[in-house]
Swiss-Prot record:
Pfam families noted in UniProt: HTH_53 (PF18606), zf-CCCH_PARP12 (PF25261)
Protein name: Zinc finger CCCH-type antiviral protein 1-like
InterPro entries membership: WH-like_DNA-bd_sf, ZAP_HTH, Zc3hav1-like, Znf_CCCH
Keywords, sorted A to Z: Acetylation, Metal-binding, Repeat, Zinc, Zinc-finger
GO cellular component: cytosol
Acetylation is among the record's keywords: yes
GO molecular function, one term: zinc ion binding
Length: 296
């Protein structure tokens, strides 16, 4: 089985099991050794499969502990057994302009956002909705094929998007993201606010700050209550948090390397030019003409 076909199948299996599985469990669906399966996943890269060594925990499932393990806080820190966890990652996104009726065709999915959240008022009579509920339209088929996702059914695609696409994340409080107050920003509702008090740039995968004064924690007591009230999937938000933390670390590392490269290139350039070169690099500025003095 070619890697592309195999990766499509592995994504399908992962999304059929909530978007993440332990490597050993995933191996039960393919006739490959653990070493060969791990090699396939690594070749595909973290833009397709995120692999993490996490500590195995006893007892009931705990969302906050799951996030902590995904961030590396639990991997081996307690001295217990560890296992490799695999998460399905994708660049597939819903087209935001299509939601507003402004796009006829692009490289993103043209699907009703509310339908993918299971909240479209027209879900029982989808033909009355102005937005598509069909993942198999020509545009959507082309997008899915280009990303190796064509074999997914609607439920599996929903799982994949919920843990990757910021468009499907619950509404973030815009007022919280303004102002100098670290705890509430400009949000006057404070603890009574029914929107997420998290960094909107982090959710979008664009936050350049490390550390950031806004919260990057999507899973805690207050947000768990919001998720429960809005009947949203805690498991999908846990996955979204783990993938977002990875993306934030990757972005921060890239920015650090860019800053380091810029700081080292400038002295090297001046060193090669020497003093004369440094002078020649300056723009030529004509001397200011002096006005003649009046006779005494």
């Amino acid at each position: 089985m070619a890697d592309l076909t195999l990766c499509a199948f592995l994504t399908k299996v992962l999304c059929a099991h909530g978007g993440r599985m332990f490597l050993q469990d995933l191996r039960g669906h393919v006739e490959l050794s653990e070493a060969k399966l791990r090699a396939v996943l690594r070749r595909a890269g973290p833009e397709r499969f995120l692999l993490q060594e996490v500590e195995l925990r006893d007892g009931p499932w705990d969302a906050e502990a799951e996030v902590a393990a995904g961030e590396g806080a639990g991997a081996g820190s307690g001295g217990g057994a560890t296992a490799c966890r695999v998460m399905a990652v994708s660049s597939a996104r819903l087209c935001a302009r299509y939601q507003r009726g402004e796009c006829q065709g692009c490289d993103q999915l043209h699907l009703c956002r509310r339908h993918m959240l299971g909240k479209c008022p027209h879900r029982d009579c989808w033909s009355t909705c102005s937005l598509s509920h069909d993942i198999h339209t020509p545009i959507n088929v082309q997008v899915l094929k280009s990303r190796g996702l064509f074999g997914l059914n609607e439920g599996q695609l929903r799982i994949l998007l919920l843990q990757n696409d910021p468009c499907l994340f619950p509404e973030v409080c815009q007022m919280y993201n303004k102002g100098v107050d670290v705890l509430y920003g400009y949000c006057s509702l404070k603890d009574r606010c029914n929107k997420f008090h998290v960094c909107k740039s982090f959710v979008r995968g664009e936050c350049p700050f490390q550390p950031c004064k806004r919260s990057h924690q999507l899973i805690h007591a207050a947000t768990l209550k919001l998720l429960e009230d809005q009947e949203l999937s805690v498991s999908s938000v846990v996955n979204f948090q783990i993938i977002s933390v990875y993306r934030h670390k990757k972005l921060h590392k890239m920015l650090e390397e860019k800053d380091h490269s810029a700081s080292t290139e400038q002295p090297q350039g001046l060193g090669k030019q020497g003093a004369l070169g440094a002078v020649e690099a300056r723009p030529f500025l004509p001397a200011r003409a002096q006005s003649p003095r009046k006779p005494q």
